[in-house]
Swiss-Prot record:
One of its GO terms (cellular component) is cytosol. It catalyses: tRNA(Pro) + L-proline + ATP = L-prolyl-tRNA(Pro) + AMP + diphosphate. It is found in: Cytoplasm. This is Proline--tRNA ligase. The keyword Phosphoprotein does not apply. GO terms for molecular function: aminoacyl-tRNA deacylase activity; ATP binding; proline-tRNA ligase activity. PANTHER family: MITOCHONDRIAL RIBOSOME PROTEIN L39/PROLYL-TRNA LIGASE FAMILY MEMBER, PROLINE--TRNA LIGASE. It comes from Pseudothermotoga lettingae (strain ATCC BAA-301 / DSM 14385 / NBRC 107922 / TMO) (Thermotoga lettingae).
Amino acid sequence: MKFSQLYAPTLKEAPADAEVISHALLYRAGFIRKIAAGVYSYLPLAKRTLSKIEAIVRKEMNEIGAQEVSMPVIQPAELWKTTGRWDDYGPEMMKLKDRHERDFTLGPTHEEVFTHMVKDELRSYKQLPLFLYQIGPKYRDEIRPRFGLLRAREFIMKDGYSFHDSDQSLNETYEACKNAYRKITEKIGLKYIIIEAASGAIGGNESHEFVSFAPVGETNLLKCEKCGYSSNDEQAPYRGKYHRDEEIEKPVELIHTPNVRSVEQVAEFLNVSKNKIVKSLLFIGRNGFVMALIQGDRELNIEKLKVHVNDQSLRLAEPDEVLQAFRVPIGFIGPVGIEKVHVVADCGIKYMKNVVVGGMKKDYHYINANVGRDFSPDSYTDLRVVQPNDPCPVCGEQLTGSKGIEIAQIFKLGTKYSKAMNALYMDDKGEVKPFIMGCYGWGISRTMAAIVEQLHDEDGILWPRSVAPFELIITVVSAQDQDQRIFAQKLYNSLLSSEIDVLLDDRDISPGMKFKDADLIGFPLRITVGKSLKEGMVELKSRNSSKSIKVSAELSKINSVLFKMLEEYNPHERV
């Protein structure tokens, strides 16, 4: 490919809405362009990198016996209603109606569609296990699309589904896929960690995430340096000791707290510490309102709450919904005297005394409220977001924290979907049973962004060789110099015959602009054909190095050096 023919519009400045480096650099380097919030076009450079990521994923999936298919993006509501997820999935599901007023969704995931496809075809245990996958677009109506490709409304994903006749068979495929994902991540060139994860709206009883390290990641990682335990803050259980107040219970009082709503404001106004305040958070689910109580200095884990009340549709109530239902603004809601609401409290609440809670009246809070006397939760469970310095749930050592980007997740689904959809087979004893299933996702477009978050410098992107849009670029310093043009073309043809993915920058622009574009786009290797050609030399420079080396302008010598440089190239190391 010649740069003069390549559609790669580079920019000096990032778009104003670029909050993270991957968004800024992919936009500036001519990989993506925004169509609407969370919706992007992939330009030729992006397509080349995405295709290479897909090829790595496809190869490893095929090697463990998975078979590729292509499923429809548009899915009828009936399938999702069968499993209950039409309502449970939440507002992130993109729903639409056809001209006949029939409900459909643009698939955020494909459990129902895959199960529906095989349910009438797989009849016997002899046809199991079966592992199918696809690579294609997914859709989620993010409430606030941001961070470029990291939280988009449309994204590219590999999703796979396996069908089994035993837990042992599922476990074997699950481990095979986990190992394949390790190989994929290493071939792509990311530094990563595997952690225990929550199953969320997908369901199942076991899940793991592959998370690439990045300071802007939305995944909060927790790790124990002593025993090796790792998880994210959605999944990690709290195993610390709860503080037990030994105070004498005081009389409860309703105090005027004008326009004081947040925990911080309440603590300052009443001159109390945050751990003497109980936050009351209202959620709406299938069965109405749920109130969650958590200590004021801790964050609530909504995933734990969803599991406890068995309702994945649970969402935080809007201010107008709270006001309409209780005639009380958010910020003054509390558990004292509230009716027809299921109240779930964090386990630590039962040991607190003389706490501050919302007064169920605008501009009022209760002080000295006590569990059992003034309010009684319907149930207790662990609702805390586990934080760095909390004890490890395995060995008790303090946990350390870091940030990361989830690039893949695998699930043991069990029989959740097969039971709901009556997807049955006959086992070796003649008994009819539901399939045991697994699910295996990989974010293709998200991976491209994760690479940039991890591998960049002040000049641009540093692509790993395996996924770079081109492995190297030949830069012709002067397009007007016939000798440079002829030699560069000769070198270009030679590299093409060696099956090197090469781009020839033949544009008639300044050398400085060419060098800046090469660094911005992030080609692993640059060969400069310039003035030194008159001395019989060309210059080779790795993207991760500040130094270039001169090599004799003989094709055999150039090939020998560049192959060695490409083999040794490691974008994680600066040399």
